[in-house]
Amino acid sequence: MERSGTARQPQLLGQKKDKFWLTVGLCALTAALFFLPFYIIDGGFFHYAGDFNSQQISFYRYMNGFIKGAGYPDSAFTSVHNTFSWATDLGSGVMNAYSFYLYGSPFFWFSLLFPQGWLPYLMVPLLVLKFAVAGGGAYLYLRRYVKNIDYAVLGACLYTFSGFTVYNVFFNHFVDVVALFPYLLWSLDEALYNDRRSWFAFWVAVNLVNNYFFFIGQVVFLAIYFICKLSTRDFRLTAKKFGLLAFESLLGAAMGSILLVPAVLSILQNPRTIDLSSGWGFLTYSKVQQYLAILVSWIMPPDSPYLTSIWSEGVIKWTSMSAYLPLCSLAGAVAYWKAKCGDSKKRIVGTCAVFALVPILNSAFYALNSSYYARWYYMPVLVLAAMTVNALEDHNTDLDSPARGISWLMIATVAFAVVPVQDSDTGSWSFGVLKNPGQYCAVLGFGLLGLLLYRYLCQKWRGDSRFAQRMTAAVLAFAFLFSVVHIGIGKFGQWYTDSDLVKQDTNALLLKNDLPEGDYRVDTYKIHDNIGMWLDKSCLQYFGSTAAPSILSFYPALGVKRDVRSEPELSNYALRGLLSVEYLITTPEKQTDFENEADDGWEYAFAKDGYAVYRNTNYVPMGFAYDYYLTQTEYEETAKATRANLLMRALVLTDEDAAVYGKYLTHLPEGRREELYYESYVQDCRERRATAASVFQMNNSGFHAEITLEKENLVFFSVPYDDGFTAYVNGQEADIVEVDEGLMAVLCPAGENSIDFVYQPDGIRLSRALTLGGIVVWLAYTAYFAWRKRRTKRA
């Protein structure tokens, strides 16, 4: 008799008993229902909190227009178009800046079918589509492991509405990964069990293009998955099968490398990698609460991404730490664990648990990124869903005792609510260490209620032929209720700051047409993130992790923090002149605060479209020359607080470049490195303005400038340095000099000069060749096996 949970030949799509489309429909309907209340409240412009509001809505709307050429004009100098985004921080290559977020996502490319103005209103329909696709993929994967296809439907719903997926609505593009991953695992199973060819290569390519960062973790997980299944002899491995699987892996990687090579070259310049001198940090987390949070995240529903119910220490917020299965928690998976010996699913989940608890192993899912994340949990969640439905389908499995055990573990967390605490300052005593008691009660209540309903259904209906369908209905109802509460906590928890988001975003579209003409940067004061993207202007305030890597060296050198956002303080006035900021935008409500905080260099310009606009009287047009230079060694010996002032006076060259280009400038005397006051800054701006380009035009592949010089000199542009840029002076290619620890300059002769900077992602030629070659090989490979299959059938 065949064991429950072992692999078998699945039903094929289109067969009478197949329920693929039913699963897709159920997942889509459930997602639509729990988004519906918020969709109505927001009038169709759904906004949530944090990253969703600041990044995802802005990115989707902006990139829809950018890809269609709705932003800056094409360059007249080159045939290269739509490669450089000025609205991304100080300017960034669009492919590298958005590959992590959406550039390779099939859902984003599908959204291009709709007008740019529709995108804020399509965020919910796109999320519903992602949930539907996730359900379909999970069903395809799970149907191999069940006897009754209804359990595959149930497992797909468990995966699709897991705590991980619902939590990551906050990040939006993470749901893309959740949606596409099951197809990758399904195609691997097809190759291992059925010797089915070409699908694995295809889904490797799709997942790699979709998100290169998450794909690293998928490679690690697939290795764990393959080794664990091989160790339990779930499939017969031959040299031929292994060779073809390796070939398809490489072929898929080649087809999906269109974004990979440029992204890798960009990441190598990004300082957010692991500290290889960590020592104990490799093996243990520094806070005990981190371990408790990890363990609890596998059994209890998740907190809101930016609110913790219990934890006061450790890295918890925004980490996507949840492996919770709706209604069931780990009850079914633990029941399966107890019932099976030497099972591959147990080994996969056990290995993943070890990886979760060891920092260096956890970071392996993210190429040894130094920041803690749990954004790979969706992969073991799919296996946990399989274990759960296998336990439910096997009538010999004890389901009740694991459910009781998980319930008691949940109840044990009440200790955090009643433990006595003495205030170190007053000496008074109180009860509980909860950070958000209300959210904790909601999470605990849903966790216990889910297990109570789970036990009731198992006891009453387990022997019924419709047990799987009843459990599916309960899971979907539970997922609906919890998702509404979870999203509501996150959404309305920031309502006091986000209630005017839609108004500010839509007003920014009006202001875009009312701002004075010209190519300049803007700044904002105490308004919502990424307004610059709605204005289609380079803005000093930008929230995004993957801007040009040189920005991550330029800002810290000035004492300006740059991790996932750029937000130089208003007090750093000299940055505004250096970076060619001409206008600052705030709201009428914040005008008084701004005027009290700002320096004398701002004058009121006008109020329109719900905004107040100020003009920078120390504005310097982009593209100007210097009289003085400073070596990087000398620059790093100065005080960070006044370095921006210093950069208005002198160009900073590396010691090597100073030996080559120093002859065109005068070495800044030591005495002039200290006179760094506002008055001297105004004079420096006046001098730089006198040498500025007469023409500066931004375009969607870089920029064009025209400048007249009295002598041969370096011309400075406050544009982030990137290996993808090629400079042309008077039509001739010229070397680009990295200056000021992250910006650019180019040497120009005396007289009139026409300068063009053209951007193409570094490595794009190689990645295109790999992708096109891979596609040709894949088509031939697929055609061969299709031909062989037809010939075999005829025989």
Name every feature range the model reports, one short phrase each.
Residues N194-D195, F214, K345-Q504, E752-A795:
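Contiguous transmembrane helix-bundle modules in multi-pass membrane proteins
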Residues P37-Y145, D150-P182, V206-N210, A293, ...:
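Active-site lumenal/periplasmic loops and adjacent helix-entry segments of GT-C-fold
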Residues A134-Y141, L180-L192, V220-C228, L330-Y336, ...:
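Transmembrane alpha-helical segments
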Residues L113, M471-N713, F717-F725, N730-A734:
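Soluble catalytic regions of membrane-associated enzymes that act on cell-envelope
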Residues G5, P10, G14-K16, L665-A795:
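Active-site-proximal, structured, solvent-exposed surfaces of multi-pass membrane proteins
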Residues C27, F131-R144, D150-S231, L244-V264, ...:
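Membrane-embedded helix bundles of polyisoprenyl
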